Amino acid sequence: MRKAIVYCHDTEAGLLEESTPGRGYTFTYDKQYMMDRTHDPVSLTMPFREEPYQSGYLFPVFTNMLPEGANRKIVCRSWRLDEKDFFGLLLKIATHDTIGAIIVKEVEF
């Protein structure tokens, strides 16, 4: 199982988990982040709630951060990643200087 902390505007917003590679994902908002109403949800399609969001595919707010087409092939080849490993790719490219307010940092075990 791979995990990543999701930051929104440099504040810890929640935890993204891949339970089954390529098929099972969970996003859980950080309780303190939700309590501060000056913070925004990570996506309009994922409003604040205490229950985890679960999906059979990586949530669109995160897949939209990934390169596409020829750029994806080049990036995956250079990092020796499977082009279908969206979570692995997210962990490599979304750690800093992203377009938008969200960054993602892998939780090391």
Language-model features, listed with the residues they occupy:
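Phosphate/dinucleotide-binding and metal-coordinating scaffold of catalytic cores
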Residues: M1-F109
